[in-house]
Amino acid sequence: MKLIGLLIVAYLLGAIPNGVWVGKAFFQTDIRQAGSGNIGTTNTYRVLGPYAGTIVMVLDIAKGSVATLLPIVFHVQTVLGTATPLLFGLFAVLGHTVSIFDHFKGGKAVATSAGMLLAYNPIMFVIAAGFWVSLIYWTSIVSLASMIAFTLITLISLVFQDWYLTGIALVLTVFVFYRHRSNIQRIRQGTESMVPFGRGYHRRQAK
């Protein structure tokens, strides 16, 4: 019962639609009705500005981390052993993408998955975050940077032979690519939105 109860808590944490709540509470704006309509960091940044976008990113990362740490704090173990926190992190990701507070819709799972990685393996999180930031600088396309970063996490976890993380990272990578399928189409067409900085943005502006 304790395990089931905490998994429900992990799902509910992940289900918190930070982008929607921040937009409505402080900007009187429903970001689901603006920009791409997504409730995550990128659309919040685009619609409400960098401060709101940063706040939502931090909150989405935090809910993934807190959910992942639940079995450690409450001393819960499963057959996964030391990988049990990943199960809780997955429930948070599920909540984020299929939120009970958002008519079972949600975001694209990037920041919440990053929060799960932060709690489970901080060193790998730092490596992945470094790649992600570098990719954003070079491409100015958050969606592309996110998809490449997830792929790299899968490869790095494979190199370090963390099989549980490799399996989960692979599943999440496929899922993230699926959730970004419209972005992939726009990237191919050269019409994907860019953040207003970085080399990719300046290359487009110079044309």
From Swiss-Prot:
- Going by the entry's taxonomy, the superkingdom of the source organism is recorded as Bacteria
User: A single GO BP annotation from the record?
Assistant: phospholipid biosynthetic process
Query: Under which main EC class is this enzyme filed?
Result: transferase
Q: Does the keyword Lipid metabolism apply?
A: yes
Task: Recall the GO molecular function terms of this protein's record.
Answer: acyl-phosphate glycerol-3-phosphate acyltransferase activity
**Record field: catalytic activity:** an acyl phosphate + sn-glycerol 3-phosphate = a 1-acyl-sn-glycero-3-phosphate + phosphate
Transcription regulation: present as a keyword of the record? no
Keywords annotated in UniProt: Cell membrane, Lipid biosynthesis, Lipid metabolism, Membrane, Phospholipid biosynthesis, Phospholipid metabolism, Transferase, Transmembrane, Transmembrane helix
Q: What is its EC number?
A: 2.3.1.275
What residue ranges are annotated as transmembrane?
3-23, 54-74, 81-101, 122-142, 158-178
The UniProt entry lists membrane topology as: Multi-pass membrane protein
Q: In which pathway does it act?
A: Lipid metabolism; phospholipid metabolism
Q: Where in the cell is it found?
A: Cell membrane
- GO CC, alphabetical: plasma membrane
Q: Do you know which Pfam families this protein is assigned to?
A: G3P_acyltransf
Q: What does this protein do?
A: Catalyzes the transfer of an acyl group from acyl-phosphate (acyl-PO(4)) to glycerol-3-phosphate (G3P) to form lysophosphatidic acid (LPA). This enzyme utilizes acyl-phosphate as fatty acyl donor, but not acyl-CoA or acyl-ACP.
**Subunit structure as annotated in this protein's UniProt entry:** Probably interacts with PlsX.
Q: To which protein family does this belong? A: Belongs to the PlsY family.
Which NCBIfam families does this chain map to? Answer: glycerol-3-phosphate 1-O-acyltransferase PlsY
Listed name of the protein? Glycerol-3-phosphate acyltransferase
